[in-house]
């Protein structure tokens, strides 16, 4: 009986693992089913707000239709200002239709992405939601008029993401205020003057990456540039990369969103980079390490050691090492076990029998040391992610999916049959 119970516990744990849901929503895919919001979706992508929305849990997007967006874009706002305005329409809480009509005490203040950026003074980044007479729900910036109203629910993935339509763009003088002109910022000049000259010069020699950086700056950007010593040691490996891989690597070291240090510390988790494009994920993970902030991939971990600039829409941080994307470098070069000790001079096999007994002392080819060569074989393609991991992404509708898909379902079914037969 004890043996059966032990087996059942193992089966239960496997079932629990296979049926664990993964957070995965894609706001632009969800909006793709609704053509009347195509302009709103387009500017979520252009301002990189879509990336920020997709990586957050429990969020509400207050979308406006194409007519309302046309009225907004006709005012000639820069992309940075549009980003601030639209970020006021992203609530950091879940409000489905039911919750909107059942707000406690009839009114609630919701924090927004605009508030989270730190650019909103006081409570100007909060939105007031109030239940009005006749079933209406009004929206307005904190302290302002309730001039926009709930129209309908567009898409809901309960307690994950809710996309609702409101009647007009939320008016906010603070969000619509002019932002610093990013074109006036000399990216490479800032890097060169603060210990990242080698990286800056490398970026300048790559027209494709330089253009991507400059075009992304207006919408907000964070760069993680390796210090000069780290970059000098990496250059031989970089020079062995193909031209497309060089550009992808440089793009990987920048995130298409502005993050102050405080924001990085409060936004731990995976982030898309400028290199993120479809199947080529090129993600990095931000994680606190005490007062330090670390950046991780499957290949290595680096620490942020200095702030070069932190002025919206641009933040540049120096790192102690070169962060390596798994898409370009092999983990085996970093994670390989230490080489076996070389045999003593006297450890020479005198006979087949003796050799067999001393096989453990046989000299092996040394694996690259993480300290001396942490960059993998740049000429070889990196190993792709596990198939099961690929199955954990959102489907075409942008909804949550079960890990492993059909494969997991088959395994679960087999385990259930096994459990039933075992008990009988």
From Swiss-Prot:
Induction: Down-regulated by abscisic acid (ABA). Glycans are attached at residues 26, 128, 160, 186, 240. Pfam families: Fasciclin. It is found in: Secreted, Extracellular space, Apoplast; Cell membrane. Residues 355-366 have a biased composition (Basic residues). Preferentially expressed in flowers. It comes from Arabidopsis thaliana (Mouse-ear cress). Residues 25-170, 184-323 form the FAS1 domain. PROSITE patterns: FAS1. May be a cell surface adhesion protein. Residues 397-424 form a propeptide. It comes from the Eukaryota. This is Fasciclin-like arabinogalactan protein 1. Residues 338-393 are annotated as: Disordered. Residues 1-24 form the signal peptide. One of its GO terms (biological process) is root development. SMART domains: FAS1. It is a lipid-anchor; GPI-anchor. GO terms for cellular component: apoplast; plasma membrane; plastid; secretory vesicle; side of membrane. Its main location: secreted. Gene3D superfamilies: FAS1 domain. Keywords: Apoplast, Cell membrane, Glycoprotein, GPI-anchor, Lipoprotein, Membrane, Proteoglycan, Repeat, Secreted, Signal.
């Amino acid at each position: 009986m004890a043996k059966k119970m032990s087996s059942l516990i193992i089966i239960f744990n496997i079932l629990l693992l296979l049926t664990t849901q993964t957070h995965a929503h894609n706001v632009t895919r969800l909006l793709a089913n609704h053509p009347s919001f195509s302009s709103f979706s387009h500017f979520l992508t252009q301002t990189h707000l879509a990336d920020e929305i997709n990586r957050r849990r429990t969020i509400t997007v207050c979308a406006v239709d194409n007519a309302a967006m046309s009225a907004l874009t006709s005012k000639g706002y820069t992309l940075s200002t549009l980003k601030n305005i639209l970020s006021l329409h992203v609530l950091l809480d879940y409000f489905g239709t039911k919750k909107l009509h059942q707000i406690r005490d009839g009114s609630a203040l919701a924090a927004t992405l605009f508030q989270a950026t730190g650019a909103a003074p006081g409570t100007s980044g909060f939105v007031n939601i109030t239940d009005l007479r006749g079933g209406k729900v009004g929206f307005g910036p904190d302290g302002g008029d309730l001039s926009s109203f709930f129209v309908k629910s567009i898409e809901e993935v309960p307690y994950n993401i809710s996309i609702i339509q409101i009647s007009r763009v939320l008016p906010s003088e603070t969000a619509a205020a002019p932002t610093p002109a990013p074109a006036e910022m000399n990216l490479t000049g800032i890097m060169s003057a603060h210990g990242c000259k080698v990286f800056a010069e490398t970026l300048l020699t790559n027209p494709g990456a330089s253009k991507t950086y400059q075009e992304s700056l207006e919408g907000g950007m964070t760069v993680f540039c390796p210090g000069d010593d780290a970059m000098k040691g990496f250059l031989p490996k970089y020079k062995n990369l193909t031209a497309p891989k060089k550009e992808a690597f440089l793009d990987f070291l920048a995130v298409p969103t502005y993050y102050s240090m405080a924001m990085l510390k409060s936004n731990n988790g995976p982030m898309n980079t400028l290199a993120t494009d479809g199947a080529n994920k090129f993600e990095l993970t931000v994680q606190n390490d005490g007062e330090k902030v670390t950046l991780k991939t499957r290949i290595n971990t680096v620490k942020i050691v200095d702030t070069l600039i932190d002025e919206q829409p641009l933040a540049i941080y120096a790192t102690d090492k070169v962060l390596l994307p798994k898409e370009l470098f092999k983990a085996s070069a970093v994670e390989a076990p230490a080489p076996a000790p070389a045999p003593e001079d006297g450890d020479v096999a005198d006979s087949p029998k003796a050799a067999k007994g001393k096989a453990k002392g046989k000299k092996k080819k040394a694996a690259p040391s993480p300290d001396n060569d942490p960059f993998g074989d740049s000429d070889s393609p990196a190993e792709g992610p596990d198939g099961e991991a690929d199955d954990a992404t959102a489907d075409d509708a942008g909804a949550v999916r079960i890990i492993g898909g059909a494969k997991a379902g088959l395994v679960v079914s087999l385990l259930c049959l096994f459990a039933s037969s075992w008990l009988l």
